Amino acid sequence: MWREKGNAIGNWLLAITAIFGFITLIWIPQASAECQTRSIYCYECDSWTDARCKDPFNYTALPRDQPPLMTCNGCCVKMVRHQRSRYEVVRRMCTSQLQINLFMVDHVCMMESSGNGHMCFCEEDMCNSSKDLYSHGHQLHLIITIAVAVSWLMGQLLNR
């Protein structure tokens, strides 16, 4: 009996590992390559010199009343310093202006250790206009949810 349970658990763990391996092989290189090879439009501004760059961003304004757009061969970036204070600074740009490994930043937000600022990356046209770029990174959550559901189903099938 213990041997059968051990084999079932081993099979279940093997299935989970295979699923996560498959997802990693397909999803991560695709996302990284997409960010590096496709041209998108990003806002280019700094709230120190252009009040239109501040949050909340008025994306319904006429194009002439918005910060300039630039063609970007990479990802859009939004950086915030001194968040939620009167000294808040917002900068929007393209990763081509940064020395950064795109594989490490695709669909990611990094927080300052003090919690007073963050830097987010996204890969859709004008996506750095968003107040909260976390909304652009739901793909990872979806993949993890699907993987857990498939693992649970496989575990149920293996236990029959």
Curated annotation (Swiss-Prot):
Signal sequence residues: 1-33
PTM annotation, UniProt: N-glycosylated probably on Asn-58.
Entry comment describing in which tissues the protein is expressed: Expressed in mushroom body (at protein level); overlaps with expression of Sh/shaker and nicotinic acetylcholine receptor (nAChR) components also involved in sleep regulation. Expressed in the adult brain and head. Enriched in the mushroom body, anterior optic tubercle, superior protocerebrum, antennal nerve and visual projection neuron fibers projecting into the lobula plate of the optic lobe.
Chain positions covered by the region annotation Loop 2: 78-92
Alphabetical GO biological process terms: regulation of circadian sleep/wake cycle, sleep; regulation of synaptic transmission, cholinergic; rhythmic process; sleep
Region (Loop 1): 55-68
Intrachain S-S bonds: 42-76, 45-53, 72-94, 109-120, 122-127
Glycan-carrying positions: 58
Membrane topology of the entry: Lipid-anchor; GPI-anchor
Lipidation residue positions, type GPI-anchor amidated asparagine: 128
Subcellular location field: Cell membrane; Membrane raft
GO cellular component terms attached to this protein's record: membrane raft; plasma membrane; side of membrane
MF annotations from Gene Ontology: GPI anchor binding
One Pfam assignment: QVR
Annotated keywords: Biological rhythms, Cell membrane, Disulfide bond, Glycoprotein, GPI-anchor, Lipoprotein, Membrane, Signal, Transmembrane, Transmembrane helix
Transmembrane stretches, start-end: 138-158
Propeptide: 129-160
Quaternary organization: Interacts (via loop 2 of the three-fingered Ly-6 domain) with Sh/shaker; this interaction may stabilize both components of the complex and may be required for targeting or retention of Sh/shaker to neural cell projections. Interacts (via loop 2 of the three-fingered Ly-6 domain) with nAChRalpha3 and potentially other nicotinic acetylcholine receptors; this interaction is required for antagonism of nicotinic acetylcholine receptors.
Task performed by this protein: Bifunctional regulator of neuronal activity in the mushroom body, and possibly other regions of the brain, that acts as a signaling molecule required for homeostatic regulation of sleep under normal conditions and after sleep deprivation. Reduces neuronal excitability by enhancing Sh/shaker K(+) channel activity; possibly by stabilizing Sh/shaker to increase protein levels, accelerating its activation kinetics, slowing C-type inactivation and enhancing recovery from inactivation. Specifically affects the A-type K(+) current.
Family label: Belongs to the quiver family.
Domain remarks in the Swiss-Prot or TrEMBL record: Consists of a single Ly-6 domain, adopting a three finger fold stabilized by 5 disulfide bonds. The first loop contains a region essential for protein folding or that is required for localization to the cell surface. The second loop mediates protein-protein interactions.
Protein name: UPAR/Ly6 domain-containing protein qvr
Source organism: Drosophila persimilis (Fruit fly)
